[in-house]
Regions:
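Active-site core of glycosidic bond-cleaving carbohydrate-active enzymes
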Residues: 296-321, 325, 380, 384-387, ...
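Terminal accessory carbohydrate-recognition/targeting modules of carbohydrate-active enzymes
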Residues: 18-262, 545-549, 557, 599-670
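Proline-centered turn/helix-capping motifs that create local helix->coil transitions or kinks
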Residues: 275-278, 331-336, 394-404, 464-471, ...
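Short amphipathic alpha-helical coiled-coil/interface segments
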Residues: 264, 268-271, 448-466, 556
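Substrate-binding groove/exosite segments of carbohydrate-active enzymes
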Residues: 244-380, 388, 407-409, 484-494, ...
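The feature captures the catalytic groove of carbohydrate-active enzymes
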Residues: 204-233, 284, 288-294, 339-361, ...
Length: 670
């Protein structure tokens, strides 16, 4: 049966690969690069980049004329507008092109062509310019756009290089543009958005010489605020320190697949940069020109927070703890639902569609976060809330033993019935984590045993209530009466419920569900959400279908990293035009940590390890893992006898196992 599934999958993969288009290449530096001369033009794209007080969606293109164009959409999450709701961040678009104001020998600079575009924590273009259309290029301009790591500011660095065989005089004008919003529209009155050029003047450049100037786009309160005098080059150094230090020095993936390695690195960037400093503390926000200074039970509690301990990014861990504590404030004696979202810098909430299974999302995410974080202090703060959420879910059980909820994270976009598979699976995983946490929190053996018994009963109920033949596949109905395949049928596989793994993956990877952009939300629709595709990939690895999962993960990574919309996982289509929401990047990283490497936390310093290495790989490693309060590495190597040799190195000490593929080992870090 598994061979038949693999054969059918191969046909689907071949068809999908034929429709994919690679536009980018991976450079030795780790950046991705676009050569406009090597692709069909015009080409256009958008990318989001963020810092603690700003986010920028850069919409850029290389036209059929090979000219580079850029528009910046600036978002300032802590500058709130009225109505101060989910979407109440100050926003302003800036399309100013400063280069036509620059001159060479008193003649206007004219762009001739684009040589290269690259992305590596910043958006960089290299363009050629002269003083007349069609004339020989005289200068090469490198323009780099990036967000400040700490300030409400987006920055640009321009470097102009003389590529002519003669001396030139470069003239850069003074430039300042400001916009003042209406006081009646701002929570704190009027706001000023100001763009400034630094480095104006005349520069004599011999052949091969370069000169640089910079621009900044910032915002501040008109009353009581003032513009910052920017040091753009220092801001660039800080941005690169974040990329090279916080991101590149931890959780380093090595596999034979360079595309997956690179996309994992880029996903680490997006998952970690989208954290905003607000009056409510550090708050991760999905982004997408919509979701800032706010958290959700799915995007943050469920998707991205459990990832941060592995990276060891202190800002991420702080935002995760703050997120859970904010929701903990809403536990109540009546066991009414917690809000789905905490918005407006933590000052308001949103629960517009009722209970989405939010407490189940928290139990899954917080349980895994606390175990992987390895901090007793944090666990003591959150354990009462975790127990409350578990009890809330228990009280929602229907007569068949699965939890009720009004809807799910898709919020009525697609039907979810009165009880859905997503809420049930998340609650199940929360119970498993609680059984591990309980003794660490001083609970009795009976308490831990109770959580395990509840998990066992729920697992059985999931099989009996949701297990079904849908469309000819032995898989799951997403809700009672559902007769169309749904993407979220992948969830049981992520949490060790693999009774129907083969039929489920055959359904998900069939041509009825799988597309070049991932898995359809529902059979027969045109809608896809990356989040369920990423869960499915994690589940496929976890269930032992590593070869099938690898092909799909490679295709997905190639599409997102090197295709026509790069370089991060996206939210959805057609909704949102494939915005780079950052929670999905956290889910990509968890495909690796929890799927490929099969890490399942079991204590503050222990985990189960189930290496799910594809058969065509001879080895792989994950280095400098910062979870459990340690810095350790995992390496897996296939031996001549068909076994897998595992090395776990921590604190200068190495432990080795030799296992059969599919076996699980229990690791305790000492």
């Amino acid at each position: 049966m598994k061979k038949l599934f693999a054969a059918a999958l191969a046909l689907i993969i071949t068809a999908s690969a034929a429709t994919a288009q690679n536009c980018w290449t991976i450079a030795r530096s780790g950046a991705i690069e676009l050569d406009p001369a090597a692709i069909a033009l015009p080409y256009s794209d958008h990318i989001e980049m963020s810092g603690e007080q700003v986010s920028c969606v850069a919409r850029w293109s290389v036209g059929a004329d090979s000219l580079y164009r850029l528009e910046r959409s600036l978002v300032f999450p802590a500058l709130r507008v009225i109505p101060n709701n989910t979407h109440g961040s100050l926003m302003r678009r800036v399309a100013t092109d400063i280069l036509p104001m620059v001159s060479i020998d008193n003649r206007t600079l004219v762009q001739i062509s684009t040589s290269k575009v690259s992305i590596d924590g910043a958006l960089t273009s290299v363009t050629l310019h002269s003083v007349a259309p069609g004339a020989m290029p005289e200068v090469e301009v490198t323009q780099t756009l990036f967000p400040s790591t700490k300030l409400p500011m987006v920055c640009e660095v321009y470097t102009v290089k003389n590529i002519a065989p003669w001396d030139i005089e470069l003239n850069v004008p003074e430039y300042c543009q400001s916009f003042c919003s209406e006081a009646s529209r701002g929570v704190d009155g009027a706001y000023v958005v100001q763009s400034d050029l630094q480095g104006a003047g005349s520069y004599k450049l011999q052949p091969g010489d370069s000169a640089s100037f910079t621009m900044s786009h910032q915002a501040y309160r008109k009353s009581g605020g003032s513009p910052v005098k920017p040091d753009v080059k220092a801001e660039y150094a800080a941005r690169m320190a974040f990329i090279r230090g916080d991101i590149d020095s931890a959780l380093i993936l090595h596999t034979p697949d360079s595309t997956i390695n690179s996309e994992f690195r880029f996903a680490k960037i997006r998952a970690s940069e989208s954290i905003y400093r607000t009056k409510g503390g550090l708050m991760h926000g999905p982004g997408g020109e919509s979701y800032y200074a706010a958290t959700w039970c799915n995007d943050e509690c469920e998707y991205v927070n459990p990832f941060y301990p592995y990276l060891g990014y202190s800002t991420g861990n702080e935002s995760a703890l703050n997120c859970y504590l904010q929701y903990a404030a809403f536990q109540n004696d009546e066991y009414n639902p917690i809000p789905s979202s905490i918005i407006a810098e933590g000052t308001a909430t949103w629960s517009g569609v009722g209970d989405r299974g939010d407490a189940a999302m928290v139990t899954h995410g917080a349980g895994r976060y606390l175990l992987a974080r390895g901090s007793r202090e944090e666990a003591e703060q959150l354990w009462p809330f975790v127990k409350w959420c578990l009890e809330y879910c228990r009280r929602q059980l229907n007569e068949q033993g699965v939890p009720r909820s009004d809807t799910d994270e898709l919020e009525y976009r697609f039907p979810a019935g009165k009880a859905n598979l997503s809420t049930a699976c998340l609650y199940y995983d929360g119970l498993i984590s609680a059984a591990y946490l309980a003794p660490l929190m001083g609970e009795s053996k009976a308490t831990a045993k109770s959580y395990r018994k509840q998990a066992e009963a729920l697992r059985e109920a999931i099989g009996s209530y949701f297990g079904a033949n849908v469309g000819g596949y032995e898989t799951y109905q997403y809700y009672d009466g559902n007769n169309l395949l749904r993407s979220w049928i992948c969830l049981p596989l992520c949490f060790g419920i693999d009774d129907r793994a083969e039929g489920t993956l055959a359904a998900l990877f069939s041509d009825r569900m799988m597309t070049v952009d991932g898995i359809l939300t529902q059979e027969g629709s045109e809608t896809f959400w990356d989040r369920s595709t990423l869960y499915a990939l994690r589940g496929a690895f976890a269930a032992g279908y590593a070869d099938e999962a690898l092909v799909q993960l490679h295709n997905y990574s190639q599409r997102r990293l090197l295709g026509t919309h790069v370089p991060y996982p996206v939210e959805a289509w057609p909704e949102g035009s494939q915005r780079h929401l950052s929670g999905e990047s956290g889910l990509y990283c968890r495909v690796i940590t929890e799927g490929l490497f099969g890490i399942r936390p079991t204590g503050f310093d222990s985990f189960d390890l189930k290496i799910n290495m594809p058969s065509q790989w001879s080895g792989m490693s994950l280095e400098s893992i910062r979870a459990f309060g340690r810095d350790f590495s995992i390496a897996a190597e296939r031996t001549a006898k068909g076994k897998i040799k595992i090395d776990v190195t921590c604190g200068g000490k190495n432990r080795t196992w030799s296992i059969r593929p599919g076996d699980t080992v229990s690791v305790k870090l000492r």
